[in-house]
A protein has these predicted regions:
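Conserved ABC ATPase "signature" region
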Residues: 106, 110, 117-135
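Hydrophobic anchor residue at the start of the ABC signature
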Residues: 153
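Catalytic Walker B motif of ABC-type/P-loop ATPase nucleotide-binding domains
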Residues: 164-167
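ABC ATPase "signature
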Residues: 222-223
Length: 254
């Protein structure tokens, strides 16, 4: 077993991460690392333990046990340092719906102590790339889900974090918007931002550099999408997941 270390090229290190809620084990001895600049996918069905794990990595929840470092900091003692170096987008897009687009940018930029001029500069750049600069004074609640989703991601990387955590970011949007969102992810990764994304959409695993497949709180497989398909003789990541889920069910029956 290896120990979580600070300076080895990995921005996330977890060794035997466990999270219990009473007698229920949500995360069962998760061990994995995430390399700087990669797109790392946490794939699994709803209830597999993905959101629980991501909340621990973001410093929003304490693990029961295990060694975990994020951006070089221990999750038990340095959560504030971690929060300064990450971006986070939750399943609900993480925006204040009663504020305007610009007010959301200003609010979240202020959390990271960015100067107003820099917030305005980056917000205008992002809105310009999205082709919605004219919507800067629009109230978030008045915008369609696809635009809100893209804005939430833009806000999450406004301060240029080392890592951005995306928890089921494409839920509830159409396939075209999903593809556009992944283009934004690739653009962010190209700038050096590490992307950690949870999803239950099996096709989205194909877009990741590496994928961890969660089944009932455990990591059942971890590799590149191509290698996972070869290992399990599967034509798609959906087939890989089904084979792992069935194997897990058979083991539980024994």
């Amino acid at each position: 077993m290896y120990e979580a270390k600070e300076n080895n090229g990995n921005v996330i290190e977890a060794v035997d991460l466990v999270k219990r809620f009473g007698n229920f084990v949500a995360n069962d001895r998760l061990t994995f690392s995430v390399q700087r600049g990669e797109i790392f996918g946490f794939l699994g069905a709803n209830g597999a333990g993905k959101t629980t794990a991501i909340r621990i990595l973001c410093g929003l929840s304490k693990p029961t046990s295990g060694q975990i470092r994020v951006a070089g900091y221990d999750v038990y003692t340095r959560t504030e340092k971690i929060k300064q170096r990450i971006g986070y987008m939750s399943q609900r897009f993480s925006l204040y719906e009663d504020l305007t687009v610009w007010e959301n940018f200003r609010f979240f930029g202020g959390i990271y102590r960015m100067k107003s001029a820099l917030i305005r500069e980056r917000a205008d750049q992002m809105l310009g790339r999205l082709g919605i600069l004219e919507l800067s004074d629009a109230v978030i609640a008045s915008l369609p889900p696809g635009i809100r989703q893209k804005l939430a991601f833009s806000v999450a990387i406004l301060h240029k974090p080392e890592i951005v955590f995306l928890d089921e970011p494409t839920g509830g949007v159409d396939p075209v918007t999903r593809r556009q969102f992944w283009e934004m992810i690739y653009e962010a990764a190209a700038t050096g931002i590490t992307v950690f994304v949870t999803t239950h959409y099996m096709d989205e695993a194909e877009y990741c550099n590496r994928v961890s497949i969660m089944v009932d709180g455990k990591i059942e497989a971890l590799d590149t999408p191509e290698q996972l398909k070869k290992t399990y003789n599967a034509g798609s990541m959906n087939d890989v997941f089904l084979k792992l889920a069935r194997r897990n069910e058979e083991q539980m029956k024994e």
